[in-house]
Each structure stands twice: as C-alpha cells, then as structure tokens.
Swiss-Prot record:
The active site is at 11, 138. One of its GO terms (biological process) is isopentenyl diphosphate biosynthetic process, methylerythritol 4-phosphate pathway. The keyword Nucleotide-binding applies. Its EC number is 2.7.1.148. It comes from the Bacteria. It catalyses: 4-CDP-2-C-methyl-D-erythritol + ATP = 4-CDP-2-C-methyl-D-erythritol 2-phosphate + ADP + H(+). Catalyzes the phosphorylation of the position 2 hydroxy group of 4-diphosphocytidyl-2C-methyl-D-erythritol. Pathway: Isoprenoid biosynthesis; isopentenyl diphosphate biosynthesis via DXP pathway; isopentenyl diphosphate from 1-deoxy-D-xylulose 5-phosphate: step 3/6. Keywords: ATP-binding, Isoprene biosynthesis, Kinase, Nucleotide-binding, Transferase. Belongs to the GHMP kinase family. IspE subfamily. It comes from Pelagibacter ubique (strain HTCC1062). The keyword Transferase applies. GO terms for molecular function: 4-(cytidine 5'-diphospho)-2-C-methyl-D-erythritol kinase activity; ATP binding. This is 4-diphosphocytidyl-2-C-methyl-D-erythritol kinase.
Length: 281
C-alpha cells in the first residue's frame, strides 16, 4: 500500500480580541498566521476493519483515544464518504499540546485537506466547513491554510501574500486550559479588524494590538508574565504576544540572526522551558 506524508503546520494568533459572548461560546476576532513548526503525518490505506491512529514523539503523551483525527474519521465513516476504506495514521508530534497553536485542530484539518486533494472524498466547500466545525472551532482555519483574519461573525478572510517574521516560540512546562481562560474573561473589546485588510499584519500595527486572553492567563500563571517581560527586554524584539489561550508566548523579529541570539539567551535563562526558533510561512 502507498504511504503518503504530509505536514501539519502550527498556527499562531498575532492578535486576538474577545468581542462578546453568544450562548456558551465567545465571539472572537483574530489575526492568524501559520509557522514552519509542524507535526508529520503518515497516511497508509489499510486492510483492517478499523482505522488505526498512532501518536509518537515528544508531545504525544496523554492524547485521548477520542481526538481530532478519530472524530474526523468517525464523521467521514458515518457519512459514508470514505467508501469503507480504512487508514493507518501515524502522527509525529512536534507541536506542544495546550500551547495555543492549534496542534490537534490542524492535524484534523491537514488530514481533511489530504482526503479532498487526493479525491478520496468528494464534498462541497460548505460541507468541509460543517465537518470542521463538528470537530472543533479552530479546524476550519487549517482548511487550505494561509494568512487569515477571523472576524467576530465567524467569517474568515484569507490573504495570498505572506508576512515575514522570524519568531521565538517559548512554552513553560505547563499548558493552559482553554475552557478556564475563556471562563474568566469579564470584559469585551470593540471589533477592530473589519473591514479585514492585509496592512493589519504590518509590524507597526501589530505592535499596538493585544491578545485579550493574556490578562487572564498572565494573572493565573505569573511564570507567563515573567516570560513575556523577559522577551520584551531583549534587543531587536518587535513585540511579544501569547498565542491563543496559551501557554506559548511568541516574540517577533525581523532578522533570523536576532531571533537566534534571543533563543540562546532565553534557553540560558529558562533552561527547563521548551523554546524554538521558527518563522511565519
């Protein structure tokens, strides 16, 4: 059987505003980019009666048997879209869990993209949106991933042009509970990103934006406050922002050299934290 290898890229929120709450869910708007940090997924058609999913790698511990990939496969089976074909999926996890980088969501999105591109399933654009939303709110962002603005009404505006930032991604040895962080949000921002324009991704604009979830996360976890303060104090840092609901903190640079130097300084200061250099793609 042929095996296919695909990359499942991490996403980061360059800015995030919580603009309100409707029933149990919060309305957010966000500036989103993908970065070259990725999980590696191998897909093999199988003769077995059940799909097999195997997570390996540094960040593969404690992933539930009911995960984004198993949910996707179950939906596709229930809709009889896979024509009774079964697959063995192996995921090497390089993206940390509970980091605000959508690792699990992007795994499901990457797999759905693969099935569509290889014509293993035939669905309309609207169906891929419905399937994505059944799995998780972030999944839709990974369907044909690109620079994007998520608007508070749920619409997504995508851009073909790329932005060029070198980034340091740091994460302490704990994750943040998305549910907890959102539950403590007690004030809302006015929408800022409508109409959506590419110029919002320029450093001069980004510097003055925020992630509304930082206030809650940094109060709950003083270590995140320490990380952000330290990164802000490094030379050539353009701005520093938490991604999603944390716990990853991202520092942005124009040059690879400055980013590399910052990363080595960070590792000396916080030697038990995870820290990598990456770039927007």
């Amino acid at each position: 059987m042929n095996s296919f290898k695909i990359k499942s890229y991490a996403k980061i929120n360059l800015a995030l505003n919580v603009t309100g709450k409707k029933s149990k869910l919060h309305n957010i708007e966000s500036l989103i980019s993908f970065i070259d940090l990725h999980d590696s997924i191998t897909i093999t058609e199988s003769n077995t009666k059940q799909h097999k999913i195997n997570f390996i790698g540094r960040f593969s511990k404690n992933i539930s048997k009911i995960n984004t990939i198993s949910k996707l496969l179950k939906i596709l089976d229930n809709k009889k879209l896979l024509n009774n074909k079964k697959f063995e999926i192996k995921v090497i996890k390089h993206i940390p869990q509970k980091a605000g980088m959508g690792g699990g969501s992007m795994n499901a999105a990457s797999l759905l993209n693969f099935f569509i591109e290889k014509k293993l399933i035939k669905i309309k654009k609207n169906d891929s949106k419905k399937i994505s939303n059944e799995i998780g709110s972030d999944v839709i962002l990974g369907i044909k991933p690109s620079l994007a603005i998520l608007l508070s009404n749920g619409d997504i505006k995508k851009f073909k042009n790329k932005i060029k930032f070198h980034i340091l991604v740091a994460k302490p040895n704990f994750g943040c509970s998305t549910k907890y962080i959102y539950s403590k949000v007690d004030s809302f921002s006015k929408p800022q990103f409508n109409p959506p324009k590419q110029k919002l991704f320029e450093a001069k604009y980004l510097k003055n934006l925020d992630n509304d979830l930082e206030k809650v996360a940094l109060n709950k976890y003083p270590e995140l406050k320490r990380i952000k303060s330290y990164l802000n104090g490094l030379p050539n840092t353009l701005f520093v922002r938490m991604s999603g609901s944390g716990s990853s903190i991202v520092a942005y640079f124009h040059s690879k050299k400055a980013c590399k130097k910052a990363c080595s300084q960070y590792k000396r200061k916080f030697n038990n934290h995870w820290c990598i250099e990456s770039k927007t793609i």
